[in-house]
Amino acid sequence: VTDHHLPALVHDAIVLPDANVIVNPNQPGCGFASKALAGVGVMFYVLLALRGELRERGVFTQQTQPRLDALLDLVALGTVADVVKLDANNRRLVAQGLKRIRNGQMHAGVAALFSAAGRDPQRAAAFDFGFALGPRINAAGRLSDMTLGIECLLTDDAGRAAELAKQLDTINRERREVEGGMREQAEAWLEDLMAKQADTAPPALAIFDAGFHEGVVGIVASRLKDRVHRPTFVFARGQDGLLKGSGRSIPGFHLRDALDLLAKRHPEVLKRFGGHAMAAGCTLDEQHFATFDAAFQQVASEWLDAATLSRTLLSDGPLGVEHFNAQTVHALDAQVWGQAFEPPVFVDEVEVVSQRLVGEKHLKLSVRFGGVVRDAIWFGHSEPVDATLRLAYRLSVDAYNGRERVQMVVEAAA
């Protein structure tokens, strides 16, 4: 058995699978230093160790041994898509995988997914794994048959890979529609809840609706969490009639430990649970949902203080005008950014020259910065802004008709 999750606790005792061999950097007594490995990273190191052992036994030599570096595109994709902490070791794995992809050395399925997503593999970045390829692979498991994604990554047939990537792209579009409907419903519920509490969100959120789709509860939980900065669980009814919940957390609130405490206080509520600090899942009977909701809020009220509940945006300060160019963007994009290793966010004073809505929910801005009018976009923000303000932003390049234009992607404004 290979795994990377924290072992299960039953009555304060760690319970491990009944297996001859268990490889998990997070099990007790494991001295492997890199505890943040994703499942694909664990398996990669198992293969490295196995290759070394077989080489010692004379099964093959240094020259005839399998080339495991050919797997690094898959290791990089899985590491980012699983949203594990990008510590030094994980960044190393992702960087090597990206290097191979940019050089055209990738599995047929990875190349097909880049094509289906309209992304350029020669400029591959960790962003592509998390927001382009990963969602398409995961969509199959959420709404259809997860083996589609697996086959796409494993096939050596470029034609078959392209066919599967198109199917995954179609399923992902369906996933977005399902998610959009659930999200609107959840946000309406949230607005109603906050209206009853003087526009103040409770310390934690738990929402269930009979119409929710089990496959996208985690995505909706993440969206709600981002909106109100609260630990959030979203539940849907599974095929077995039980409620399946997926949770997302905020820094300072260990979600799996919270479930463990809840289970101790209310042993009748949770049938199963597991996960990490920032993401977890659980299963319960529908009759226990109200108890779960109250108990989850109680744990949150005990563990969270005002500072933790306040959203904090860390910045890298102002950006020198001389660095506001495509070369800077490409240099940053070439690095490995992600969970717990965020890309730079800059903060500068700007004068708003014009502003308008695009797509009904995004604010398009022209701002004067460094004596030059620049483009800026604030995704998901539809309210007008003041004439002068401080923008927290990331840099991106918008390519059109072969020309590159640098724009600010707004994170916040004050």
Regions found by a protein language model. Give the residues of each.
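OB-fold single-stranded nucleic acid-binding module
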Residues: 288-292, 388-414
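Accessory interdomain/linker segments of ATP-dependent helicases and helicase-like nucleic-acid enzymes
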Residues: 313-374
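Beta-strand/loop nucleic-acid-binding surfaces
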Residues: 259, 368-384
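Short amphipathic alpha-helices in soluble, non-transmembrane regions
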Residues: 259-262, 293-300
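Single-stranded nucleic-acid-binding OB-fold domains
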Residues: 354-360, 379-383, 396-407
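Hydrophobic helix-and-loop "lid/oligomerization" segment in the mid-to-C-terminal part
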Residues: 18, 52-288, 318, 357-361
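OB-fold and OB-like beta-barrel modules that bind single-stranded nucleic acids
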Residues: 274, 332, 351, 386-399
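Hydrophobic, small-residue-rich alpha-helical packing segments that form membrane-like cores
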Residues: 1-42, 52, 63, 67-70
